[in-house]
Regions:
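Beta-strand elements of modular eukaryotic interaction domains
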Residues: 1, 79, 114-115, 143, ...
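Non-heme Fe(II)/2-oxoglutarate
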Residues: 1-87, 91-96
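Short beta-strand segments enriched in hydrophobic/aromatic residues
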Residues: 16, 28, 103, 128, ...
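Residue-level preference for beta-strand/loop junctions
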Residues: 80, 118-120, 161, 176
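Short beta-strand or tight-loop elements
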Residues: 84, 95, 120-122, 165
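Short, conserved beta-strand element in jelly-roll/cupin
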Residues: 88-92, 106-133, 180-184
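Histidine-centered catalytic micro-motifs
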Residues: 96-104
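Catalytic core of Fe(II)/2-oxoglutarate
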Residues: 131-187
Length: 187
């Protein structure tokens, strides 16, 4: 099994047409900078949001480039699994996300919807445009081909004993990159 099979990397074409992607971009305008948090203790799918928050700290490092995001309800279910967190991410010139694994707090459903007691299984990203330069997606150090409207899915569990792929987006050097990003959840 190769590294990408281990992390269940798969691509599903034509989730949205280019026109639908343009409409998603047009309908999302209330962007805010992402808050960067770090887990300070092991998180549990049974914790409420207050407890999950108490087990994190906000990172105030000015060197961390904070990507803008806008909450969305475009996708609420994927492959029969609930989606509790969906957002449009906006990468402007100079924006990037370093290679990382998502922190546990964001992969616990109770942070987003109380008393659901689930953990993330997969992260899915759907490129919404391609009129930019840079902004390459990498999963486990492999550059992933991006096509507008195509879903790219890989393991990003909220359970530390299950697969959690390293991933990131290189710096955007020209234009603005938009992507719909969401997490699927399971018991």
């Amino acid at each position: 099994m190769n590294i990408l099979q281990e992390y269940r990397l798969k691509s599903t074409p034509n989730i949205f047409t280019r026109e639908q992607c343009d409409e998603i971009i047009k309908n999302h305008t209330d962007y805010e900078h992402d808050v960067v948090r770090r887990d300070t203790a092991l998180q549990s799918k049974y914790y409420d949001r207050k407890t999950l928050e108490e087990n994190t700290e906000v990172i105030e490092d000015q060197n961390i480039r904070k990507v803008k995001q806008c909450s969305s309800n475009v996708i609420t279910e994927w492959e029969g699994r609930p989606v509790y967190r969906c957002k449009v991410m906006k990468y402007e010139v100079g924006d990037k996300t370093d290679i990382h694994r998502d922190t546990q707090w964001m992969c616990q459903s109770n942070w987003w919807v109380p008393e659901t007691n689930m953990v993330a299984r997969d992260l899915v990203t759907i490129p919404l445009n391609d009129d930019y330069e840079g902004g390459q997606l990498k999963v486990e150090n492999v550059r992933i081909k991006q096509k507008v409207g195509t879903a790219i899915q890989f393991a990003q569990s909220g359970d530390l004993d299950l697969p959690r792929a390293l991933h990131g987006v290189s710096e955007v050097t020209k234009g603005t990159r938009y992507a719909l990003v969401f997490w699927t959840f399971e018991d």
